[in-house]
Each structure stands twice: as C-alpha cells, then as structure tokens.
UniProtKB/Swiss-Prot annotation:
A motif (Microbody targeting signal) lies at residues 537-539. Pathway: Carbohydrate metabolism; glyoxylate cycle; (S)-malate from isocitrate: step 2/2. The gene is acuE. This is Malate synthase, glyoxysomal. It comes from the Eukaryota. Gene3D superfamilies: Malate synthase, domain 3 (3.20.20.360), Malate synthase, domain III (1.20.1220.12). Residues 65-78 have a biased composition (Basic and acidic residues). Its EC number is 2.3.3.9. It comes from Emericella nidulans (strain FGSC A4 / ATCC 38163 / CBS 112.46 / NRRL 194 / M139). It holds the Pfam family MS_N. Belongs to the malate synthase family. It is found in: Glyoxysome.
Length: 539
C-alpha cells in the first residue's frame, strides 16, 4: 500500500464530486488533508474548549487583561515579524469578497493592490461554494479563469500585474461536514487552507508571489501558534522553505486584542501583520460581556470607530504592528454605490472618504473595500497621505493603551425602536440569504456579511437580557422582541420572492433575540440547513 493510500484509510468525501472538482480533490490532496486533521485536530478541539472555559471566567466577572505570563515577549524589543513577502510590500487598498467565478474575475481586474478571496464571512459554506471557490482560485492563479455568462464575457486583464491574492480560510470553530477523517468532520480552516496551499503554493511562488492567508476569529496567541505549526508542517510536506507562507491575522475578538504582540510573535516567521475586523470586534465585545449590564451598547449606528473602546483598539493595533515591523491594515468600507440617487450616493462616498482619511492619518498601511467602485476613493486618500509603500515608520510612541481603555464602554448614543427594527431587518435578511447559500447580501446599500448579522442579533439579545428601555420609553423584553421580530419577518416574507426563507430565518432568529439561549456563532447555528452530507464519493 502506498503512503497516500495508507493516509486515505477512513477518509470519506460526503459531497458530490464533479469532474471539475476532481482536479482539487485528488488522492494526494486528500491525503494531505488527512495528515493535517490527524496532527492538529486534537489541539484545535482543546483550544475551542479553552474558549468555553474563558467565557465562563468572564461571566463570573474576571475580565480580560494583558497576560502576565507573556510580559517578557511584550517587553523584548529585539524580535520582529517577517519582512513583507513579494507582492505584500504595498497593500494600500485590498478588495474583499467571496470566491464565485464572477467575483474572482472582477476583483482581480479592480484597481487595487490585493484581493482577499473569502471562504469565510462573505461565503455561505455550502459544499458547492467551497469546492467551486477552490476551483476558481486554482484557475485564476493559472490565468485560465475567463468565462462567458449569457452574452457577457469575463476576462482577466492583461495590461498590468494583477493584485496579489490572499485567501481567507474559515475560523477554527467551523467544521466541514462533507469531508471526514476517522469518522470526524475536518476543520473548515484546515480544509480551506490545505486544498489551497497544496495545489497552489509552488505555482504562486513561481509567479513571483506566495501562499498568503488571512486568519480569522482567533481568540488567543495559542490559536496563532496552532496556525504556525500548521504552516511549518505544510511547507515541510511539499518541500518548501519555512517562512514562505504569510498570514495576516484579523483582530476581531476582544480577547485577541489583549494578545496582539504574542500573536505576531507566535507567527513571527510567517506574519504579515494584523487587521482591524470592525464588525466582528463589536460582535465579540457584546458576546464576551453579554452577562454584564455595564457593557450594554447603544444602537449599532452609534458604535463608530471613534468611540473609546474602538479608538483604543485601533491605536494599539497600529503601534503593535509597527513596533514589530509588520502591516497594520484598516477596516472595511462596506458601502455600495447608490445608482439612482446622486445626492445620497455623494453623501455615502463622502463617508467612505472620511473613514479612509481617519485610517491613513492614524497610521494604517492599507484598507479594505467591498466594491470595486470604492477602490478609487480609498486609493486617492492613501496615495495623498501615504507616499511610501506603507507607514511602518509611523511608530505611534505617543500611544499608551491600558486594559481600561480597551474595555471603556462610555459610548454616547441611545437605544431606539428604529435601531431594534434595523437589527431585525439586517439579521433576518442576512440569514435568509445565507440559508439560500449566499454569504454576502446588499442591504440598504451596504454589503453585509456574517459579522454585521452577528452584531445585530447580539445587540437584540443583550437588550432583552438586561431589559433596557428605548428612548421612546418602551421596555425591551421577550414579548416585545418577539412581536417586532414577527412583524419584520412577515413583512420581509410578503415582500420577498416566492420560495424565500424569511420564516425559517425568523424561527432561528427567535431563539437568539429573547435574552435566553445564545449560540456562539450564527453560522454554526445554521450550518446544518445548508450542509447535505450524503453517501461517500469514491476517492
């Protein structure tokens, strides 16, 4: 029996495998996935249990703080992260989006520096979405992704170097139920990373780039250590020098914010910086402190990047990254053009401009946009205020952020019925799309992904849990939350196309907005609705 066949013992693919998919789900690639699972899944499960234990401590009132046991790492000025890899020196504007073929072509044709191809929050992880995404990136890297849809042709431009590709894998908490090893589903992280790396790492290096990743939803430096171990094994396995991979970590949980230096340290030979994951960070803030009434936040529109706890997080991230010689990436501009209202569009674009100006002046090295039309605005601002490829020389020695700063909930604003209805509308609309296999939904001219839906349902839970009173004088309780939910779900279902899933979304949402049950992640809660493991396909 060959080594590959030995690894494939007790490996099963429980999703359909098309002829196209066979070039991705090769025996060799599946054997590599099996090795990743068998080597790292026990550690992953232990780290996920650690999250549960930490939440229990926070519920008891033990709030996060900088770790005393890693103070020596923070205090040691001598170490640095890895130098920027080819194609990652200048990252002033990054476009993000799912990995469907049309998005891949449009993103790579945009006037941006990098494209974050997303298997995570802007993709619903149906088996077809995940496998087709791998096929599309495989083809894009080899410049064979052109296709025709109806009368429209989608072709990669050839007049300049294309943006650097960065793949975002799913977070450590998500499973891929269509691929099992020894009877267990593989981690979504290892599945997404493993297939992309195995097929494309050498091809990317040959083309002057490398296997680059965005790493989401981490909650501690130990989770970064696990990624680093995965990277080392993967590079050794295919005979690639260690330190070729790069990973940019999204700091989008409040616990990770206290461990930024340690996260860079754990990944130091593979680190390409940190990113401000705005909406997930707010979600994490509400989620982690949901049992504490003094952490109740006002309407989501009042929780801007300039409120104390968000401002502190941004400043600390920039200072930390530049101290260690890696990129400090800014957050998402989620606006999409308003084509039928010039005045409203101008106002929205001015908002984008102001946000990007705040980022570049703060010292960020680049920023995110969700729509190609915003790239020119972001580029214009960064080109004007950042003439160099990045701002690592901006050290922010003036910044001294304390634990109290990161936990400062002094947020001016109010809780309104309009805010409640907006949260219901966003949560229901996003969940309904996700249940149809769409992970990126335009709502009120904003491109919403899982993070914004998470903020919406977490706020509703928090307000009901603590019985807040709206500015109109209405007490938010279970009955009130469920009444408004029913009104919104009925209205959206009536207005939506035939066969929509708003009532199903409403049934799931009802369990999340009363201040009682609270699912760790909406995506985990809904996953069984869009996963359809069947009989095993032949390997």
């Amino acid at each position: 029996m060959s080594q590959v066949d030995a690894q494939l013992k007790d490996v099963a693919i429980l999703g359909s495998v098309s002829n196209e998919a066979r070039k991705i789900l090769t025996k060799e690639a599946c054997a590599f996935l099996a090795i990743l699972h068998r080597t790292f899944n026990p550690t992953r499960k232990a780290l996920l249990q650690r999250r549960v234990d930490r939440q229990a401590e926070i519920d008891k009132g033990h709030l996060p703080d900088f770790l005393p046991e890693t103070k020596h790492i923070r205090d040691d000025p001598s170490w640095k992260g890895a130098p920027p890899a080819p194609g990652l020196v200048d990252r002033r504007v990054e476009i993000t989006g799912p990995t469907d073929r049309k998005m891949v072509v449009n993103a790579l044709n945009s006037d941006v520096w990098t494209y974050m191809a997303d298997f995570e929050d802007s993709s619903a992880p149906t088996w077809d979405n995940m496998i087709n995404g791998q096929i599309n990136l495989y083809d894009a890297i080899r410049r064979q992704v052109d296709f025709k849809q109806g009368q429209k042709e989608y072709k990669l431009r050839t007049d300049r170097t294309l943006p650097t590709l960065i793949a975002r894998a799913r977070g450590w908490h998500l499973d891929e139920k269509h691929f099992t090893v020894d009877g267990e589903p593989i981690s979504g992280s290892l599945f997404d990373f493993g297939l992309y790396f195995f097929h494309n790492a050498k091809e990317l290096v040959a083309r002057g780039f490398g296997p680059y990743f965005y790493l989401p939803k981490m909650e501690s430096h130990l989770e970064a250590r696990l990624w680093n171990d995965v990277f080392n094994l993967a590079q050794d396995y295919i005979g690639m020098p260690r330190g070729t991979i790069r990973g940019t970590v999204l700091i989008e949980t409040i616990t990770a914010a206290f461990e930024m230096e340690e996260i860079i340290y754990e990944l130091r030979d593979h680190s390409s910086g940190l990113n401000c994951g705005r909406w997930d960070y707010i979600f994490s803030f509400i989620k982690k402190f949901r049992q504490h009434p003094n952490f109740v936040l006002p309407d989501r529109s009042d929780v801007t990047m300039t409120v104390p706890f968000m401002d502190a997080y941004v400043k600390l991230l920039i200072k930390t990254c530049h101290k260690r010689g890696v990129h400090a990436m800014g957050g998402m501009a989620a606006q999409i053009p308003i084509k039928d209202n010039a005045e409203a569009n101008d106002k929205a674009m001015e908002g984008v401009r102001a946000d990007k100006l705040r980022e570049v002046r703060a010292g960020h090295d680049g920023t995110w946009v969700a729509h190609p039309a915003l790239a020119s605005i972001a580029s214009e601002v960064f080109n004007k205020y950042m003439p160099t490829p990045n701002q690592m020389h901006v050290r922010r020695e003036d910044v001294n952020i304390t634990a109290n700063d990161l936990l400062n909930t002094n947020v001016p604003g109010k809780i309104t019925e309009d805010g409640i209805r907006k949260n219901l509308n966003i949560g229901l609309s996003y969940m309904e799309g996700w249940l149809r296999g769409v992970g990126c939904i335009p709502i009120n001219y904003l491109m919403e992904d899982a993070a914004t839906a998470e903020v919406s349902r977490s706020q509703l839970w928090q307000w009901a849990r603590h019985g807040v009173t709206t500015s109109e004088g209405k007490k938010v309780d279970k009955a009130y939350a469920l009444r408004l939910l029913k009104e919104q779900a009925d209205a959206l279902a009536a207005k939506g196309p035939k066969g929509n899933k708003f009532q199903l979304a409403g049934r799931y949402f009802a369990g999340q907005v009363t201040g009682e049950d609270y699912a760790d992640f909406l995506t985990s809660l809904l996953y069984n609705e869009i996963s359809s493991p069947g009989t095993a396909s032949k390997l």
